[in-house]
Amino acid sequence: MIDLEVYVEKERHNPLLRRREVYCRLSFEGKTPSRKEVRGKIAGLMNAEPERVVVDYIKTEFGKTEAKCYVKIYDTVEDLQKIEEEHIIERNKVEEQAEEAEEAEAGAAE
């Protein structure tokens, strides 16, 4: 697990789309954190289930251990499925499956 700190810069409630929009700054050591790690940290910080959290982007500057991040927290999973674009949903799912495969390979190698 990466040492990750999250600083919420702006939070906005969007009642029309039934979600909260969070702009935050990430501070970390080493490599840029994955969407799964950011989603888990923000879900814990904002008291939301990880299934309702979508990481839209993580932008880093070359050579810095900081990144800017935009996250959407939907009221329900159904709202997320109806409103969010398919490629964004897949982008947030694919990393989960890839990391699970890596963990399975690491367990098999031992």
From Swiss-Prot:
<dbReference type="GO" id="GO:0003735">
    <property type="term" value="F:structural constituent of ribosome"/>
</dbReference>
<dbReference type="InterPro" id="IPR018098">
    <property type="entry name" value="Ribosomal_eS24_CS"/>
</dbReference>
<dbReference type="InterPro" id="IPR053709">
    <property type="entry name" value="eRP_eS24_sf"/>
</dbReference>
<protein>
    <recommendedName>
        <fullName>Small ribosomal subunit protein eS24</fullName>
    </recommendedName>
</protein>
<dbReference type="InterPro" id="IPR012678">
    <property type="entry name" value="Ribosomal_uL23/eL15/eS24_sf"/>
</dbReference>
<dbReference type="GO" id="GO:0006412">
    <property type="term" value="P:translation"/>
</dbReference>
<dbReference type="Pfam" id="PF01282">
    <property type="entry name" value="Ribosomal_S24e"/>
</dbReference>
<dbReference type="GO" id="GO:1990904">
    <property type="term" value="C:ribonucleoprotein complex"/>
</dbReference>
<dbReference type="InterPro" id="IPR001976">
    <property type="entry name" value="Ribosomal_eS24"/>
</dbReference>
<dbReference type="GO" id="GO:0005840">
    <property type="term" value="C:ribosome"/>
</dbReference>
<comment type="similarity">
    <text>Belongs to the eukaryotic ribosomal protein eS24 family.</text>
</comment>
<feature type="region of interest" description="Disordered">
    <location>
        <begin position="91"/>
        <end position="110"/>
    </location>
</feature>
<keyword id="KW-0689">Ribosomal protein</keyword>
<feature type="compositionally biased region" description="Acidic residues">
    <location>
        <begin position="97"/>
        <end position="110"/>
    </location>
</feature>
<keyword id="KW-0687">Ribonucleoprotein</keyword>
